[in-house]
């Protein structure tokens, strides 16, 4: 499974969300790719998926979560993604 987190630059809320997802992924031994919306790859994802809110967690190119979860919810989401 390929996990990507699309964030809006250095906004504090995006950085906090990045840290939450990185920790949840690290606990499960899953790699997380961080993509900034300003990058070419970020712009392509925005256009392709019609993303309008950030941050966004993608699993295998599909939107799974929008916004900032609490750490426990993030951990539960990663566990669910791994068993599905």
Predicted regions and their residues:
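Secondary-structure boundary motif
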Residues: 23-27, 48, 83
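Thiol-based oxidoreductase modules, predominantly thioredoxin-like and allied folds used
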Residues: 7-9, 30-42
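Non-catalytic, surface beta->alpha helical segment in thiol-disulfide oxidoreductase systems
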Residues: 59-84
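Structural micro-motif
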Residues: 49-57
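Generic recognition of short, well-ordered alpha-helical segments
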Residues: 15-19, 44, 69
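Short, flexible active-site loop motifs that bind/organize anionic cofactors or intermediates
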Residues: 4, 36, 64
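Local sequence-structure signature of Cys/Sec-based thiol-disulfide redox active-site neighborhoods
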Residues: 1-27
